[in-house]
Amino acid sequence: MSKRRIAPLTFLRRLLLRILAALAVFWGGGIALFSVVPVPFSAVMAERQISAWLGGEFGYVAHSDWVSMADISPWMGLAVIAAEDQKFPEHWGFDVPAIEKALAHNERNESRIRGASTLSQQTAKNLFLWDGRSWLRKGLEAGLTLGIETVWSKKRILTVYLNIAEFGDGIFGVEAAAQRYFHKPASRLSVSEAALLAAVLPNPLRYKANAPSGYVRSRQAWIMRQMRQLGGESFMTRNQLN
């Protein structure tokens, strides 16, 4: 009887290990490949597209146009750093002080959860993982973040982030966002336009770049002040990000 009970558990354990090993090979290969090859689509894009189809929205298209950093306005990279991760050039994927502050805040305010994800973590999550807040996903995100921080340069991380970030319903990447909202290529985005796009990033399905609320306008102004305090374009040059 005991052998019959143990056998299924052993099978499940081996199956789980094989799945994890296969995922590790898949993700590791993806990290290596996308260190030099443009990203055709992300996990978030695939998730949005499949959800739309399952919901009967057959006209939905998760649209993205890959562009190199040379074809992106330096203001755009600076804007997302100012908005999302001002220590991006310094850390190895995790902003520990920010994580500690977020944990302390969330203990006091359970109804208003604050995140502390760096651009590296967001890139790993958007590229390879699903939406959610489970400990499993967080653990996988941490491993993938270490992987891309080890293999990719900071410039590459920022380039991929800007090409797969969600800026609105079906709008992925800064080139698609620039064309949709401002009718111009990403290379020609101004300071204020870049700050406006960065202002919707906390929740691009709630906040609209083409119909900005008072909160979005206020956040846009704050981001522009932070961009100046960081040093403007010289920040990007100094940290070899453009």
UniProtKB/Swiss-Prot annotation:
InterPro entries given in the database record: Glyco_trans_51, Lysozyme-like_dom_sf, PBP_transglycosylase, Pep_trsgly
Enzymatic reactions: [GlcNAc-(1->4)-Mur2Ac(oyl-L-Ala-gamma-D-Glu-L-Lys-D-Ala-D-Ala)](n)-di-trans,octa-cis-undecaprenyl diphosphate + beta-D-GlcNAc-(1->4)-Mur2Ac(oyl-L-Ala-gamma-D-Glu-L-Lys-D-Ala-D-Ala)-di-trans,octa-cis-undecaprenyl diphosphate = [GlcNAc-(1->4)-Mur2Ac(oyl-L-Ala-gamma-D-Glu-L-Lys-D-Ala-D-Ala)](n+1)-di-trans,octa-cis-undecaprenyl diphosphate + di-trans,octa-cis-undecaprenyl diphosphate + H(+)
Location of the protein in the cell: Cell inner membrane
Keywords associated with the record: Cell inner membrane, Cell membrane, Cell shape, Cell wall biogenesis/degradation, Glycosyltransferase, Membrane, Peptidoglycan synthesis, Transferase, Transmembrane, Transmembrane helix
SUPFAM superfamilies: Lysozyme-like
Enzyme Commission number(s) from the entry: 2.4.99.28
GO BP terms in the entry: cell wall organization; peptidoglycan biosynthetic process; regulation of cell shape
Topological type in the membrane: Single-pass membrane protein
Biochemical pathway: Cell wall biogenesis; peptidoglycan biosynthesis
GO molecular function: pentosyltransferase activity; peptidoglycan glycosyltransferase activity
CC per GO annotation: peptidoglycan-based cell wall; plasma membrane
Annotated TM spans: 19-39
PANTHER family named among the record's database cross-references: BIOSYNTHETIC PEPTIDOGLYCAN TRANSGLYCOSYLASE, MONOFUNCTIONAL BIOSYNTHETIC PEPTIDOGLYCAN TRANSGLYCOSYLASE
UniProt cross-references to HAMAP family, sorted A to Z: PGT_MtgA
Function statement: Peptidoglycan polymerase that catalyzes glycan chain elongation from lipid-linked precursors.
Similarity field: Belongs to the glycosyltransferase 51 family.
Record-given protein name: Biosynthetic peptidoglycan transglycosylase
Lineage: Bacteria, Pseudomonadati, Pseudomonadota, Gammaproteobacteria, Enterobacterales
Gene it is expressed from: mtgA
